[in-house]
């Protein structure tokens, strides 16, 4: 009798586990690294993106459009951006500044906000259209990300060199310079844009790694890197830097 009860108990546990196995892993993906999540918990999905546990996605989950919209336009996004920028400043203010000590910033999603573009294109649920995005960039109306602008001004006042390293292409130099100044970024050491004809840098990580290597050869001491994409922060030739990842749940750049 005891044996029958034990067998029944074990069988009940196994059935229950099978029924609820999916619930234990609510972020398990159907395809890719996160393009479709059938019962996604959007705050958890966003955290996994920021922690680089979900990557390589082309679009955000359809179920998360409203949650993403609320996050981007709510207090949390601004607070998250503020916290990251504050930590960069707290780190910087304790350093002894030397003439070629440099902070490297990405541009889109880091110093200039592209939320106005994504607001018109589904907050990341639409696949990226480079033609439409370039048209938006060429208008030169991207606003500053306010917490980054505050941090930028503090770093400049401390005496750090500022270098903007962007995936924008060389043909956008004039509009990018004008947009930066219009948004309040009044001075910088270098603005580095991508040569689309260069076959040696097929993706963002290799391009930004090569650019940092060149900066180090030129004598710059990279003490900090600030970006909204992991491709801004990964790779070699980061000098003695700390890296600071700003929030961006809208898209992923390889």
From Swiss-Prot:
Residues 1-21 form the signal peptide. Glycans are attached at residue 129. It comes from the Eukaryota. It comes from Glycine max (Soybean). This is Stem 28 kDa glycoprotein. GO terms for molecular function: nutrient reservoir activity. Residues 22-34 form a propeptide. May function as somatic storage protein during early seedling development. Gene3D superfamilies: HAD superfamily/HAD-like. Keywords: Glycoprotein, Seed storage protein, Signal, Storage protein.
